[in-house]
């Protein structure tokens, strides 16, 4: 279960880092947004290495589902746009898939 905590923290750091660049490059905010963006993206990379997985690719694949879910929470609470029901359905499918990837090796032993 600790893996999910690392995934969630990493996801919000990645989204925040990318959003900082979005603020600068797409919304015309100050280039100083790059600094917290780089810090956040570095923290994202460090957090993702905390996940217990035999292979990096498997950890990244499982992380993808959590990232999709975190993105919708970001959409709702930071950008203040209401996700559609189909967005939540997609998230549910992604999280189920991520769980299969993460726990699959334990089930196949």
Swiss-Prot record:
SUPFAM superfamilies in the cross-refs: Multidrug resistance efflux transporter EmrE (SSF103481)
- The superkingdom listed in its UniProt entry is Bacteria
Q: Which InterPro entries match?
A: UPF0060 (IPR003844)
DNA-binding as a keyword?
Answer: no
Membrane topology reported for the UniProt record = Multi-pass membrane protein
Subcellular location per the Swiss-Prot or TrEMBL entry: Cell inner membrane
Question: Which segments of the protein form a coiled coil according to its record?
Answer: none
**Gene Ontology cellular component list:** plasma membrane
Protein name from the UniProt record: UPF0060 membrane protein PA14_21660
What is an example of a Pfam family matching this protein? UPF0060
Disulfide partners: none
Q: Which HAMAP family match?
A: UPF0060 (MF_00010)
Family stated for the protein in its record? Belongs to the UPF0060 family.
Q: Where are the transmembrane segments?
A: 5-25, 27-47, 59-79, 84-104
Keywords for the protein's UniProt record, in alphabetical order:
Cell inner membrane, Cell membrane, Membrane, Transmembrane, Transmembrane helix
Predominant subcellular localization, coarse grouping: membrane
């Amino acid at each position: 279960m600790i893996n999910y905590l690392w995934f969630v923290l990493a996801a919000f750091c990645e989204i925040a880092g990318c959003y900082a660049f979005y603020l600068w490059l797409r919304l015309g905010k100050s280039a100083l947004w790059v600094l917290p963006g780089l810090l956040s993206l570095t923290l994202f990379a460090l957090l993702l290495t905390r996940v217990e997985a035999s292979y990096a690719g498997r950890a990244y694949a499982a992380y993808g589902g959590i990232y999709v879910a975190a993105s919708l929470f970001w959409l709702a609470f930071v950008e203040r746009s209401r996700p559609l029901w189909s967005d939540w359905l997609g998230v549910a499918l992604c999280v189920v898939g991520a769980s299969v990837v993460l726990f699959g090796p334990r089930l196949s032993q």
